[in-house]
Amino acid sequence: MKILQELPLVERARQLRHTFVEGLDGKHYKVLTFALYDFKPPPEFATHETNVEETNERGGRTVLIQPLIKRFFREDEALAFHQELLEKFDETLRLKAPEKKEAKAGH
């Protein structure tokens, strides 16, 4: 995995960290950690989420593919998971490098 860019945060979207990466499989992903609410929810509700979205090379969604969504009750745990996910991105999502096709001789 290669980090392409730490994206600027959008405060109104309650973003805490937003990272644009390229996986071992050559596809592009956004890793986003954010607060689910702008108010204090009841204690039985998770308050933060980290998710991964598959994107095109410019970071736009072509289809909504989210290979990972995880919710947390504490902001520090969500941010720690975001960092851990970046460190072990390919292993966590079980990404493999694309197979190289050999060129046929004579063509």
Q: Which ranges hold each PLM region?
A:
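Short arginine-rich
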Residues: 69, 83-98
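Short N-terminal "domain-start" leader segments
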Residues: 1-56
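A short, exposed loop/beta-hairpin motif centered on an aromatic-Gly-Thr core
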Residues: 62-77
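Short acidic DE-rich linear segments
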Residues: 104-107
